[in-house]
Amino acid sequence: MPVSRFAVFGHPIAHSLSPRIHTEFGRQMGVALNYLAFDVAPDAFRVSLERFVAEGGCGANVTLPLKEAAFEVCTTLSARARRAGAVNTLSRVDGVWHGENTDGTGLVRNLTERHGLDLRGRRALLLGAGGAARGVAPALLDAGITEMVIVNRSPERADMLCDALGEPGRVSARYWGDLGDLGNFELIVNATSIGNTSDMRTFSLPRSLLDSMTAAVDLNYGSAAVPFLAWAHAVETRYVIDGLGMLVEQAAESFSLWHGRRPDTDPVYTVLHSEYGAPGRS
């Protein structure tokens, strides 16, 4: 049986669970595959991707900080990827790269189906404006978010994301220093990498951001999610959710694009959550 070659590219990448997830999906679905992880800095991404193709690579996932760089290498793009301006799934089609973004679908499926949240009518705060934020923002809007406020330490990037989303009546950008003046939100999504540079003793957000039904969601998982989730628990947020479920769901979407069949995510999520999942409240 021929073995298909896939990979995940990121920087850093040693923490990635994607190889394990896709290997388990392949075993479940009877698909022979070889899935590797490559630690690649942004300036070396294009060359590394060309080498991967030369060695038989036919599909790849892309994580931070390469999602916008992946967008640039694509000859064709899905509507979701084009709207996001970021790519997390690459497929080799007729000798060129086709780009897709499954992050938003993975997040919404995890929140609505696994955690039972109804996103319709919620006011959302999105922290961050990089590749991770770009991937999930369109899907959150499509899921019925009433208003989205984007806050980023570099306000220019928040403005760029607002412009790309093209919904000025629903989406606005504010400064990080304005957080205490924004009112409360039913959904707070951390799409930053702040968990890699902060600890639970120093990370904090204004308590005024919360109401009685707020869901605090970190797109990170494991140690990178600890500071944000620790804050959310400390201020008694109603729902506290890490990014592990989103990771598994977006991986299943990528697997389906490559192999034409969507695996069952619950068995994989259950095992990984027992090992890596942060304590949650949902």
Swiss-Prot record:
A GO BP entry: amino acid biosynthetic process
GO MF annotation, one: NADP binding
Q: In which pathway does it act?
A: Metabolic intermediate biosynthesis; chorismate biosynthesis; chorismate from D-erythrose 4-phosphate and phosphoenolpyruvate: step 4/7
The active site consists of K67 (proton acceptor)
**What does the record give as EC number?**
1.1.1.25
Lineage top rank: taxon? Bacteria
Q: How does it assemble?
A: Homodimer.
Protein name (record): Shikimate dehydrogenase (NADP(+))
